[in-house]
Each structure stands twice: as structure tokens, then as C-alpha cells.
Amino acid sequence: MPGFKFGKDQRLLRASEFQEVFDLNTCKISHPNWLLLAKFNTSYGSRLGLVIGKKNIPTAVGRNYVKRLARETFRKSDFPCSIDVIFLARKGADKLNSQDMALLLQESWCRLRQRCEASKAKNA
């Protein structure tokens, strides 16, 4: 199944890439269990960076669960513009069941897409 891979070209890898999104984000979506920060990029396509701290989700099982669902829903959502997104987990993100979390993440990705498109249209 080559079409379902989440490769290195779809991830933020270096600290400088993360810092750039933290410093220059143009879109922000807040949810009680996570925060999404996004910045337009020029040449990469859409990329995702995950920040899931041990302080907010203490167990490795919980952190891996949140990462897996965030990656999967991001991969399935199609972003028409090239953006870098940081998913920042908050306390309680691992307490949601997978169906609820997947649905809430899809809604968050849709809101982020709409907000980024509006921001891009405003700046054009």
C-alpha cells in the first residue's frame, strides 16, 4: 500500500523547522486537548510536526496513540496549499476514544484548512 505511507517529506524534522512555525505561524486552531499552529511554506507540500510532552501525556502508550491518530488524520485530510503544521498535545488528549478523537481531529483539520485559505486570500 504505497499510497498510505507517511514519509519523511510529510514531516517537520529539524528544530529550525519547528522554531520557524512557532515564531511565524499564520493560522492557529485551539481545542481543549490540542493546539494546531500552521505556517505557509513555499516548496515542500503539507508537513506535520508533533509535540507531545511527557508532562501532558505521561504514558508512552498514550503518547503513541495520540501520535498515530494525529498522523493518520493529517495524512487523510487534503490541504490545497503547502503548509507546515505543528500538533501540540494538551492534557487529556489520550483520554478520548479513537472514534471521537479522529472525528474531532478531522474537524480541526477542516477548520485549519478554512482559516489558512482565508488568510491566504486576505494576504493576496
Model-derived segments and spans:
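Positively charged, solvent-exposed patches that mediate nucleic-acid binding
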Residues: 1-124
